A protein has these predicted regions:
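N-terminal, positively charged nucleic-acid-binding surface of large information/translation enzymes
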Residues: 2-183
Length: 183
């Protein structure tokens, strides 16, 4: 039986071989970028046009990256790269959204809590402690997947919305807007 006569799934064709070749190429490119600190060099290069601030809204830290994260992340990578090529200095700092319902729902489900009274009975302080402990269970996966998308972002110096300094900066910003009667 010739290759053309085989069922499509068992044929050896260029797309099957190409995937393996592409995977090898991906690994080589990522290794080259890492060994030569290419991302870091973009941050160190001369920026005659000054700073360009790019606000990158962080993903929730409670799950694995999905298509929506990858798509949004690609868009969020293009703009800072473009501005860097135009001569701006653009910090690209990763962030983690650690607040709100996603983490609360996750902990409630894990602990079998269904109502506010259940949480109070369990103990709010203990509930919050469990939430903080579980927030970064997927961090390793994110740190592996995001660079594989080709995105250049500083994940080692990430900000976390649950950190006091971050929360205080949000309150400070809100106060500035309030005093200017913008909110």
């Amino acid at each position: 039986m010739t290759n053309e006569e085989k069922p499509a799934l068992t044929r050896e064709d260029s797309s099957t071989r190409g995937r393996s070749e592409r995977a090898q190429r991906e690994e080589k490119i990522l290794q080259f970028w890492k060994e030569n600190k290419i991302f870091e060099k973009t941050l160190e290069k001369n920026a005659p046009k000054g700073e360009f601030v790019f606000y990158d809204g962080p993903p929730f830290a409670t799950g694995l990256p999905h298509y929506g994260h990858i798509l949004a992340g690609t868009i969020k990578d293009v703009i800072p790269r473009y501005k860097t090529m135009q001569g701006f200095h653009v910090l690209r700092r990763w962030g983690w959204d650690c607040h709100g319902l996603p983490i609360e729902n996750l902990i409630e489900k894990e602990l079998g809590l269904e109502t506010k009274k259940d949480i109070e009975k369990f103990g709010v302080a203990e509930f919050n402690k469990r939430a903080r402990e579980s927030v970064f269970r997927f961090e390793k996966d994110w740190k592996e997947i995001i660079p594989r998308t080709g995105r250049w972002v500083d994940m080692e110096n990430s900000y976390k919305t649950m950190n006091t300094g971050y929360m205080e900066s949000v309150w400070w910003s809100f106060k500035q807007l309030y005093e200017k009667k913008l909110v």
